[in-house]
Structures are given as structure tokens and as C-alpha cells.
């Protein structure tokens, strides 16, 4: 790895990325090394194929959807800033930072609301602001695989949408999604401890 260095100053726009993501310099340096390791051809960016080589994503039923979140608007190249930005959603919430946060500043990427927005977009494939019954069925099918019959899966889907759908339109809006997850500790469930 001769040309690859471990100095923080080599990361393009490091200060901007640090402010946007909330990552410490040490965490950014670790992420940058991971980014470089995934960039086997030293192109300076990652492709979908590079991310598909990550074992945890390869076996995750939502792996393809998670990978899609790294490539917004049909982009084909993922630079380090985008890589760090998506991973920032999974950064644990630091209670001290939350209490000291300037309300005039944008909400941190790892806030409860932003974690929920990230999760919502994994379901809302057509980006219409609602999770349709069909979208919910697709996600549940990915998650349970062949462990349940199609009939059971249809029933689970109908019940899930029905319980969350407060306005009776047959779909789950973002507001309904957040209300349905009020009691869930999303801050913990959507955090990766190594991402501080």
C-alpha cells in the first residue's frame, strides 16, 4: 500500500466532512482507510461492485437497498465524502453533543429523525413519500425469505400497513412511519458502535 498514507490532511475536504458528519478526525481516518481498502483499483471512488464485496452487505437481505443509498440520483461513483455521509446515519448519538447542539445548525445526520428518514427510504422505493402495501411486501419478503408462506407474508404485510396507516389511504407516510416506531429505540438499533 505504498502510496496510501495515514495522515488526516490527505482526506479531501476533511474539515467540511467532519462538520457535516460529526465524526472525529480519528474516526474519519479509520473510515478513509476502509474506503481505500474497498477501492482496490485505487480509482479514488467506489462503485456498487466495490460495496457488494462487503460480506455484511452481501448477506443482509436489505443489502442492495443499503448500497443504493450510497448512490443517490443514479450516480455511479461514490467518493469519500458520500461514503462518510451515509455512514454518519449509523453513528451512535452522543447525548452530550445533543444537549450542546446549536438549534440554528442543521440536525445531525445521526439524529433520531434522520435515522428514521434513512430507514424510511429503504422501504419507499419509488420515492413518493409513502410506503405502499407492495413496497412493504417486497421488504418483508427480502427479510423473511422462504421461512413463511406467501399467504402468511400477505397477512403480515396487510396487518403491518393497517396498524401504521392512520389516515386509511392504504399506505404508510413518513409521519405514520415515525409514529409506528415511537417506542422503538431506533437510536440504538441504527447505530454501529465503531462509528464514533
UniProtKB/Swiss-Prot annotation:
Q: Name one GO biological process term.
A: sodium ion transport
> What's the domain of life for this entry?
Eukaryota
GO MF, one term, reads: calcium ion binding
Annotated EF-hand domain residues: 26-61, 71-106, 111-146, 152-187
InterPro entries attached to this UniProt entry: Calcineurin_B_homologous (IPR051875), EF-hand-dom_pair (IPR011992), EF_Hand_1_Ca_BS (IPR018247), EF_hand_dom (IPR002048)
Which residues are Ca(2+) 2-binding? 165, 167, 169, 176
The UniProt keyword set, sorted, is: Calcium, Cell membrane, Cytoplasm, Lipoprotein, Membrane, Metal-binding, Myristate, Nucleus, Phosphoprotein, Protein transport, Repeat, Transport
Location of this chain's protein in the cell: Cytoplasm; Nucleus; Cell membrane
Provide one Gene Ontology cellular component: nucleoplasm
| Amino acids binding Ca(2+) 1 | 124, 126, 128, 130, 135
Q: Which Pfam families match?
A: EF-hand_5 (PF13202), EF-hand_7 (PF13499)
Using the record's annotations, give every residue carrying the modification Phosphoserine: 27
Location of motif Nuclear export signal in this chain is 137-148
Q: Where is the lipid attached (N-myristoyl glycine)?
A: 2
Its primary localisation, in coarse terms, equals cytoplasm
> What PANTHER family has UniProt attached to this entry?
EG:114D9.1 PROTEIN-RELATED
What is the stated purpose of this protein?
A: Functions as an integral cofactor in cell pH regulation by controlling plasma membrane-type Na(+)/H(+) exchange activity. Binds to and activates SLC9A1/NHE1 in a serum-independent manner, thus increasing pH and protecting cells from serum deprivation-induced death. Also plays a role in the regulation of cell proliferation and tumor growth by increasing the phosphatase activity of PPP3CA in a calcium-dependent manner. Activator of the calcineurin/NFAT signaling pathway. Involved in the cytoplasmic translocation of the transcription factor NFATC3 to the nucleus.
According to its UniProt record, which protein family does this protein belong to?
Belongs to the calcineurin regulatory subunit family. CHP subfamily.
Q: Give the multimer and partner information.
A: Interacts with PPP3CA. Interacts with SLC9A1/NHE1; the interaction occurs in a calcium-dependent manner. Interacts with SLC9A1/NHE1.
**Record-given protein name:** Calcineurin B homologous protein 2
Q: From which organism does this entry originate? A: Mus musculus
Its organism's taxonomic lineage begins at: Eukaryota, Metazoa, Chordata, Craniata, Vertebrata
Amino acid at each position: 500500500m505504498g502510496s496510501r498514507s495515514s495522515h488526516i490532511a490527505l482526506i479531501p475536504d476533511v474539515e467540511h466532512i467532519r462538520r457535516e458528519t460529526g465524526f472525529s478526525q480519528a474516526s474519519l481516518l479509520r473510515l478513509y482507510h476502509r474506503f481505500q481498502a474497498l477501492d482496490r483499483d485505487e480509482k479514488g471512488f467506489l462503485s456498487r461492485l466495490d460495496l457488494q464485496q462487503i460480506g455484511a452487505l452481501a448477506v443482509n437481505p436489505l443489502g442492495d437497498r443499503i448500497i443504493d443509498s450510497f448512490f443517490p440520483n443514479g450516480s455511479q461513483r461514490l467518493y469519500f465524502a458520500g461514503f462518510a455521509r451515509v455512514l454518519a446515519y449509523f453513528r451512535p448519538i452522543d447525548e452530550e453533543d445533543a444537549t450542546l447542539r446549536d438549534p440554528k445548525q442543521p440536525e445531525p445526520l445521526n439524529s433520531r429523525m434522520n435515522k428514521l428518514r434513512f430507514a424510511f427510504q429503504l422501504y419507499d422505493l419509488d420515492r413518493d413519500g409513502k410506503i405502499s402495501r407492495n413496497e412493504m411486501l417486497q421488504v418483508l419478503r427480502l427479510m423473511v425469505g422462504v421461512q413463511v408462506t406467501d399467504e402468511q407474508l400477505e397477512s403480515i404485510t396487510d396487518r403491518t400497513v393497517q396498524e401504521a396507516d392512520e389516515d386509511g389511504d392504504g399506505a404508510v407516510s413518513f409521519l405514520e412511519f415515525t409514529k409506528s416506531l415511537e417506542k422503538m429505540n431506533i437510536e440504538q438499533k441504527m447505530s454501529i458502535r465503531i462509528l464514533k
